């Protein structure tokens, strides 16, 4: 047999690709594994032992940071998206059932006729000056504010089902006969015009509507020669029956609080710093029109 007819090993003449014995052989056959990072539980070929992969750690840290940034973005963008959704709902109302008066995009106009009762009966701002000019404060300092008529007009728009935002304005006119020696029979009056922004939620079932509302706003007050502009806090509840698709009738009750209602009043070119929290309860009949 001639020499050139002898079959040669595929490794002969290709020493660069030849695989030596031992661990190096596996590296020569699979050169990509030489630079492959060691995973948890793998053995280092150079000395053995279990190692954490640095690249895996970097990936874990990077993914945690990305999740944190996404959560932060949602916390920042969420309220803005909610406001935009409310504005969009107001501009593009959903065509719902005509009897569904609490659906998003619906609006309500309310007219109320109520009786208002003050929850105080003593020394309203010292307007009669009985405490200042007469030693008998028990006789001359008391101002009696009597129950009176109140009227209110309100508007609310439902930004989503049951949840509404609106505005409420009312007028209260109370008569008073202060017991003082200067004008014992002259009637005084107390006038209040509160205007408040409101937020409410309405529970609806069948034809019954049960709204709960809270609000805060501006209040104008005038009593005798005293005038005050200040804060008013309101809370209201009602019960209405849906008569038709657009009209409902019911009753409501309202609590109004005027904190520090007599601070820094101006009375006959004289400033006083008497303070009092005025509180009123009003209840009456309401008529509502649903848009």
Curated annotation (Swiss-Prot):
GO cellular component, one term: plasma membrane
UniProt main location, coarse: membrane
Keywords: Cell membrane, Membrane, Transmembrane, Transmembrane helix
UniProt entry tagged with the keyword Protein biosynthesis: no
Transmembrane segments: 74-96, 188-210
Membrane topology, as annotated: Multi-pass membrane protein
Compartments reported by the entry: Cell membrane
Disordered: annotated span: 1-55
Family that this chain belongs to: To T.pallidum TP_0733.
Name the record gives this protein: Uncharacterized protein TP_0126
Source species: Treponema pallidum (strain Nichols)
């Amino acid at each position: 047999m001639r020499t050139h007819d002898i079959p040669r090993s595929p490794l002969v003449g290709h020493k660069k690709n030849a695989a030596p014995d031992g661990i190096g052989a596996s590296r020569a056959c699979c050169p990509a594994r030489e630079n492959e990072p060691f995973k948890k539980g793998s053995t280092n070929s150079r000395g053995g032992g279990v190692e954490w992969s640095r690249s895996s750690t970097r990936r874990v840290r990077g993914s945690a940071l990305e999740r944190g940034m996404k959560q932060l973005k949602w916390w920042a963008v969420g309220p803005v998206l909610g406001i935009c959704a409310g504005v969009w709902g107001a501009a593009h109302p959903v065509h719902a059932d005509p009897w569904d008066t609490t659906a998003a995009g619906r609006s309500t106009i309310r007219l109320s006729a109520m009786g208002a009762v003050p929850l105080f009966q003593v020394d309203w701002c010292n307007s009669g000056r009985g405490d200042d000019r007469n030693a008998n404060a028990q006789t001359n300092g008391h101002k009696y504010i009597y129950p009176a008529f109140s009227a209110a007009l309100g508007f609310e728009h439902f930004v989503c089902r049951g949840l509404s935002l609106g505005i409420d304005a009312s007028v209260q006119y109370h008569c008073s006969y202060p017991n003082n020696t200067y004008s014992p029979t002259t009637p005084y009056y107390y006038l209040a015009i509160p205007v408040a922004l409101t937020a409410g939620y309405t529970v609806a079932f069948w034809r019954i509507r049960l709204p709960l509302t809270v609000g805060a706003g501006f209040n104008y007050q005038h009593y005798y020669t005293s005038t005050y502009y200040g804060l008013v806090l309101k809370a209201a509840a009602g019960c209405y029956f849906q008569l038709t698709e657009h009209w409902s009738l019911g009753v409501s009750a309202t609590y109004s609080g005027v904190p520090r209602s007599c601070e820094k009043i101006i009375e006959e070119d004289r400033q006083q710093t008497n303070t009092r929290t005025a509180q009123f309860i009003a209840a009456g009949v309401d008529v509502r029109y649903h848009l």
